Curated annotation (Swiss-Prot):
CDD domains for the chain: MoaC_PE (cd01420)
Biological-process GO terms, alphabetical: Mo-molybdopterin cofactor biosynthetic process
GO molecular function annotation: cyclic pyranopterin monophosphate synthase activity
Subunit architecture: Homohexamer; trimer of dimers.
Record-linked Pfam families: MoaC
Stated name of the protein: Cyclic pyranopterin monophosphate synthase
Name of the gene: moaC
Function per UniProt: Catalyzes the conversion of (8S)-3',8-cyclo-7,8-dihydroguanosine 5'-triphosphate to cyclic pyranopterin monophosphate (cPMP).
EC number(s) from the headed UniProt entry: 4.6.1.17
Amino acid sequence: MSGLTHLDERGQARMVEVGGKEATRREAVARGEVSMRPETLELILGGKVPKGEVFGVARVAGIMAAKKTPELIPLCHPLMLTGIDVQFRPDPERSRVEIEARVRTTGQTGVEMEALTAVTVAALAIYDMCKAVDREMVIGAVRLVHKSGGKSGVFERKGEEAWTEMQGTE
């Protein structure tokens, strides 16, 4: 179990000591998606979902979730986040909304869990906003696509293109 930093020598969970690590600029990008009926996506894009403006609510939910990550994931360190962006990319051909969260900090540990949590909760908010019209939505493909900063350097998931067109960026 030597590769698992969250376990002590007895295999018990612990919060990793990061106090001796150098503070560096860190960034993580995560993505996920919500698949839905084509009619549901049309309602979202037309601003006709009965509960209100879906992307605005989901964006705020994702931002709030990133800030609450240490309250949800037991061994995460509370961090001073310096930036959180949550964006959406509708994909009518596949009847889905793609979600991207970018989280930044200058600190002693990374923000991967914060980015993943932001995407997941933004997806849950989309589900909540649209469940009255589509209970068959599927949340999925939540993944880390980029990580930079710290001793381990840069991670880039192969096959992930940069987003050029996004919805709700105003």
